[in-house]
Design a protein with these regions (language model features):
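Conserved class I S-adenosyl-L-methionine
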Residues: 1-16, 26-32
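Class I S-adenosyl-L-methionine-dependent methyltransferase module
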Residues: 20-198
Length: 198
């Protein structure tokens, strides 16, 4: 299967999860996108879904994909997992610091007992990935940046028109999402979500 412009990887996940447990064949999936941050996000999500136990991976992936903040413990585990998993490519880049940014660098990861992910990205993508993992932005800083977009007074009409089009019962939760960016049920405890998302 080839999935170009793979901005949304849900179809890929549904296809792979839909394979029968008795499937013994080989399944090659090629995904790409021209947007660097989409590629990085998809790589991190595929890593999470492959490395962590299914229930934990589902929650981690959901918040990594959609929430503006993460619980401190989750953020720590993700950073450690990504750093360990991508150590080989990081060491390779450190040995050749003058390599041009458009040079393709590849690495492979084992995904459980049967799977393998082969990742080929320009050096610039890897550099950005590592800088994102090293970024230490405060929760307040992240909220301020997010509010400049989601709560911007110039966008008020857009927000209010959107709220008018959704059922009244959904408006308070949508407004809450505009404000805090957490994909949680309305009224759920948000106190653990203290770290800016990667």
């Amino acid at each position: 299967m080839v999935k170009t412009a793979s901005g949304d990887i849900r179809n890929i996940l549904a296809t792979v999860n839909g394979l029968s447990s008795s499937f013994k064949g080989r399944c090659n999936i090629v995904i790409n996108d021209r947007e660097m941050y989409v590629v990085i996000r998809n790589l991190l999500l595929l890593w999470v879904f492959s490395v962590f136990p299914p229930t934990e991976a589902a929650e981690m992936g959901l918040h990594l994909w959609y929430s503006a903040k993460l619980p401190s413990a989750m953020c720590k585990r993700l950073r450690e997992s990504f750093s360990e998993g991508f150590k080989k490519i990081s060491l390779h880049m450190a040995k050749a610091p003058s390599t041009p940014s458009d040079t393709l660098l590849s690495t492979s990861f084992n995904l459980g007992e049967k799977g393998k992910m082969h990742c080929v990205l320009p050096r610039a993508h890897w550099t950005e990935l590592f800088s994102m993992l090293d970024l230490k932005m405060s929760s307040q800083e992240a909220t301020q940046i997010r509010h400049q977009i989601t709560m911007n007074e110039a966008r008020r009409d857009y927000r209010e028109r959107h709220l008018c089009l959704i059922p009244a019962s959904c408006r308070a939760s949508k407004q809450q999402f505009y404000e805090d960016g957490l994909l949680l049920p309305f009224g759920a405890d948000r106190s653990e979500f203290t770290e800016a998302n990667l």
